[in-house]
């Protein structure tokens, strides 16, 4: 790789690392192509970027970004799983996928909004609901009082209508 290509790659990675909300460093050993393809598909579905990067380039690109706190972990055969939105997505996908092939994927560390997280933290993060689930829960919490209010306001009118209908039925019968 030419020096100009390396500099361009570092610049591109630095820009990505600057936008990162969370990233997980994982070691993949003896993983076959089919498994990596399935994993990449899961990452795409979760809007997570999966990158295998030269460690020296990744360390240089991480300087001055939130990813710099995990730059020392860029050693050996590692991949970086990056999210720009949902902070739990990379951890959730990796931990779920690692259950099937535990001996081949080893989670090393992660960074979540600028803070370094160890393996136990990554596993705990994976148990949290993702952004879509949180939005749905929040919507439910917000809409429930409004629904109760509408039912309460409508109740006297519907009760009155039932009384009038009962009287009408009684008069006809």
Curated annotation (Swiss-Prot):
The lineage of its organism: Bacteria, Pseudomonadati, Myxococcota, Myxococcia, Myxococcales. Forms part of the ribosomal stalk, playing a central role in the interaction of the ribosome with GTP-bound translation factors. It comes from the Bacteria. GO terms for molecular function: large ribosomal subunit rRNA binding. Keywords: Ribonucleoprotein, Ribosomal protein, RNA-binding, rRNA-binding. One of its GO terms (biological process) is translation. This is Large ribosomal subunit protein uL10. SUPFAM superfamilies: Ribosomal protein L10-like. Part of the ribosomal stalk of the 50S ribosomal subunit. The N-terminus interacts with L11 and the large rRNA to form the base of the stalk. The C-terminus forms an elongated spine to which L12 dimers bind in a sequential fashion forming a multimeric L10(L12)X complex. It holds the Pfam family Ribosomal_L10. The keyword rRNA-binding applies. PANTHER family: 39S RIBOSOMAL PROTEIN L10, MITOCHONDRIAL (PTHR11560). It comes from Myxococcus xanthus (strain DK1622). Gene3D superfamilies: 3.30.70.1730, 6.10.250.290. The keyword Cytoplasm does not apply. InterPro entries: Ribosomal_uL10, Ribosomal_uL10-like_sf, Ribosomal_uL10_bac, Ribosomal_uL10_bac_type. Belongs to the universal ribosomal protein uL10 family. GO terms for cellular component: ribonucleoprotein complex; ribosome.
